[in-house]
Amino acid sequence: LALDKAQAHTGLRPNPADFSVVAQSCGQSGCHAGHADPSRNHLEQVTRSLQATYAGGIALVRYTFGAQKDLSPYFGIVGAVDPQPLPQTVPALAPFAVTSASLSAEAQFARNCLAGGCHLTEPAADQPYRYRATGCAACHVLYSDDGLYTGADPTTPRDELGHPARHQLTTAIPFSQCNHCHNRGNYSLRGMTFTLRPDLPPVGALLPATMPPEGRRLREYYQPIGQFTQCEWKLDCIDCHTQAEAMGDGHLWPDQKTMQYMQCRTCHGTLTEPPATAKITDPNDPALRLARLNGHYALGVGDEVVVTERGEKLGSIQQRNGQLIQFGKVDGREYVVPLVQGSQCQQQPDQQESRFCHQCHAYER
């Protein structure tokens, strides 16, 4: 114990969720690691995820500039090993480092894109709309766009930038938290630089506080150059992307395209088939635990829910009175999920990916 502030905090880590110490905090056995149920071993999952390794991005840059012979990933921002790889994943990644033998493009990539970037090991830039923590807290501890504290702790200055909005963890992660990394701008592979969006801070002006919520959401959610369906900006990111997609599933995937599996057809089905569903029969089903932790939707044994192509139960999308109802994981709002089957959709059997749906269902800003 000490009365001096600096002495009292000696040896403490401001963010115990940072990957440098997470094995001694969140990842202790019996907490988020060491379980017989692999879905609860979040330490292994997230440290091997693409958000931690950026394996595909590193491979693309090195291949483009001739530093490796193919697009196979050999390096990650952090090194990692998967003792039980799948046929489409890799067994290990070496840590990416710039050496005297590295190409100048690799050094530029590390300096301009990886350092101070959007990856779980790197602290965020101290700029509006980019504040966040590292490690697990990058997603599970929410920050305001202006980086100011709004909680009830009297010891935290309310005018000091860089604090989370509140000192608490959550699984109800809004799109605005995801936007502190995603949708911030565009990379130039040619120039090895990152160009921030011109329509939002820190380049553009702050959006007016009087802007209606839906208009503000659409403005912030996606970049002007993109095409997106209405459900993609009406819902939050976690309403579509599953835990395994966002946090990893314990395997070292080579790139986002190979890892990502949620498609429009997962929830909306096709012209010939409705979405796949399954009943919750096991009281220990991981979907029940996720619902309890989230708190914005109820789920129980006997409920019928949508299932992904990998067998992952989507507890927030439930069969109710002959309809599929989706419950928002951030606010609990209810949405009726429209089905392709029985509609006037012109979908072709060989065109089932989401990119084909965007051709007709894109929403113009």
Give the ranges of each region predicted by the language model.
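Extended surface/linker regions that mediate inter-domain or inter-protein docking
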Residues: 2-261, 266-355, 359-364
